[in-house]
Swiss-Prot record:
InterPro entries: G_ENGB_dom, GTP-bd, GTP-bd_ribosome_bio_YsxC, P-loop_NTPase
GO molecular function: GTP binding; metal ion binding
Organism for this UniProt entry: Blochmanniella pennsylvanica (strain BPEN)
Protein residues bound to Mg(2+): 40, 62
Stretch forming the signal peptide: none
Gene: engB
Keywords: Cell cycle, Cell division, GTP-binding, Magnesium, Metal-binding, Nucleotide-binding, Septation
Name assigned to this protein: Probable GTP-binding protein EngB
Any one biological process term the GO annotation gives: division septum assembly
CDD domains linked to this entry: YihA_EngB
Gene Ontology cellular-component terms listed: cytosol
Function: Necessary for normal cell division and for the maintenance of normal septation.
NCBIfam families, alphabetized: GTPase_YsxC
Amino acid sequence: MIHDYHITHFLISVPAVYCLPNEKIGMEVAFVGYSNSGKSSAINALTYQKKLTKVSKTPGCTQLINLFEVSPGIRLIDFPGYGYAKKTKKRKNYWHDVICEYLKKRKNLKGLILMMDIRHPIKDLDQKTIESALSVDVPVFTLLSKSDKISRNILQVTSKKIIHDMKMMFETHIQVEPFSVVKKYGIHSLKRVLNNWLR
């Protein structure tokens, strides 16, 4: 099914998983990753709306789970970033723990978009997030954000290495795609994956 993402609108912000809408109605895809990994920017690029989600250069700015509705019953979930360095260890891991709870409990979750800064890939909490998703058979699509920050040659080499490392690490194929809001890398692939999941 092909969705019209440019009409996506803000639905609600909630502080916890138990506050989310009834999971028996509709389908969801969640955007997760470290603080400042580009989750909000990716949603804005996907929907062709520069201000749909608040983008901040300050890590840890988002502290609520933000829901956006593509069409009735079709939702994108923007989770706060995990691992913000200036937080205590407990707070650094807090949103990762919430995401793991969400993965286990949310029956209408169709897939996980994991944002990873291509310059700092597969950090500890990213690895644990992927493992949690795979353990409950939730597909993962990894977007290597900020790909415009490195040269094209380095981009190709780095992308291949990340794909190889993830295959060895998780013993399965994880979809990986370079992504850049500035140079429009990966937006078409993101739409394709979402349309496949949300049908």
